[in-house]
Amino acid sequence: MSAIEIVKVTDKKGLKQFIDFNHQLYKKSPYAAPEIREDMLYTLDPKQNEAFEFCDCECYLAKRDGKVVGRVAAIINRKANQKWDVKVVRFGWIDFIDDAKVARKLLEQVEAFGRAHGMEKIQGPLGFTDFDPEGTLIEGFDELDTMGTLYNYDYYPRIFEQLGFEKAVDWVEQIIKMPTHIPEKHKRVAELISKRYNLTVRSLRNKKDVQEFGPKIFGIINQAYSKLFGYSEMSARQAAHYISEYLPSIDLNMVCIIQEADTGELVATAISMPSMTRALQRAHGRLFPLGWIHMLDALHWHRPEIVDLMLIAVRPDHQNRGLNALLFSHLIPIYQQMGFKYAVVYPQLETNSRGVGLWDDLSPRTHRRRRCYTKPL
């Protein structure tokens, strides 16, 4: 068998090969949500992605006989390393054929990159920030993928463990059958806490709301997630990008906020959207020239049965007060009106008992589990 060559991505051709490999590897999978090519071009471009202000990154391809058989990004998040007082090199966007030799070569390259920068540990899959896909799927390979998460074949965890990697943390994903009505317990708790803490709940209404509350939403996210594994705060520039690129495309009825009634201060938020997986499959991960039609169709015209609960963030001083009941009492009627039958919760750290426990009263089923692996250098 021919030797495996590791090639650093240095130009547009190499970047195209890096992005294309994921699509080629999973094009026959009925479960994978294709990466959005335009998003990947932005994410891996140092001139565009604000994360490069505090991250170092190199991308590599594994080739055999001139054919791409694997890919990986080596990332050092200096901000996260400083915050957590660690020296970690991350590996992200890793894909490879069912061959441990290919994976070994790719990860050895990441390890070499890390050592050259004084790192002491390798961890992944992780992106630049928590808003990038993270965690290798270890359970739920026959469950529909969710946009913005990683899908991989079942040989990935076997090969990682074969190469000496161990568990760092796990994330769990839960699926909930949509209630036909607001549970009585949620109603009671929602009424109680809204009166006790003088809170109001509503959805965003228009572009003016997006401009006003967008930065505040990301401020709440930074506060709520600050103690979670590997988290580094979103900068104002990063938040501005997500606000301008993504919030306008979401039905604002599905962007929910809780405010203090007397001050108007934001204390919690929940963001959701229809599942985009089937739309992405039909669009083959391309927004242009015609892929956006499939996306708009799923967003507004022919919604799928699944709504993706992308995030819930509660200001630390209001956590453990049952604000989830207030959020769900507002959102469940909206979901029912839109025809959703199931809700899928985006990955949550298994150790985040507050977050995972939010859904207990709705009889959730853990349908997928993913893992961050680690190894000393």
Labelled PLM ranges:
Residues F21, L25, Q109, F113, ...:
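Generic, well-ordered alpha-helical scaffold segments in large soluble proteins
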Residues Q48, I75-K79, I312, G357-D360, ...:
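Alpha-helical subdomain
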Residues I75-K79, I94-F96, G127-T129, P179, ...:
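An acidic- and aromatic-residue-enriched active-site/binding cleft used to recognize and process polar
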Residues M1-Y31:
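Generic start-of-chain signal for non-secretory N-termini
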Residues N22-R64, V72-Q82, L204, D209-I312:
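A conserved beta-strand-loop-helix scaffold within acyl/acetyltransferase catalytic domains
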Residues K83-G164, A283-D361:
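Acyl-donor binding region in acyl/amide transferases
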Residues A3-I4, L150-L228:
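Acyltransferase donor/substrate-recognition loop-hinge adjacent to the catalytic core
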